[in-house]
Amino acid sequence: HLTTPAVRMLLMTSSESVIDVLRSAYLEELETVMNYRTNSIVLEGVRAQEIKESLEADIAEELGHAGELGQRLKQLDANPPGSAAFTAQQESLQPPADSTDVLAVIDGVLDAEDGAISTYQQLVELARAADDPVTEDLAVEILADEEAHRSEFRGLRKEYSGD
């Protein structure tokens, strides 16, 4: 189809924004994996087991998301970032000083999921604006996973805060 130079420029700018957010999301997923792994190791106590198991299960899914995002970047003729591009962001997901503080970890997970949901909502909009239905579909798929994780941990939050 025919596009004007202004429309082509807008689509190019939109495509660059899509790539920027894909790269950011890729790094966020890997940071989440690091923090989930650390918390699944550090947490202890009778109450911690369910949370540790949930974090362990989510690690594989988050790694899968990173893989999908990296592949999409490659398809767009861009590369996923290396570790030199990484700046830690997830302060609330750092291991708690008290290794039995299950609620601190749950709250950190909820913060991380809220951040991921925001990122994927932004990616959906940018991909739509860039006329990139493949990235839009990927973002919607991952968004659904992140919303499911948030729902799971909201339930755990209710359960553990009621003790």
What residue spans do the PLM features occupy?
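Iron-associated oxidoreductase/ferritin-like identity signal
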Residues: 1-163
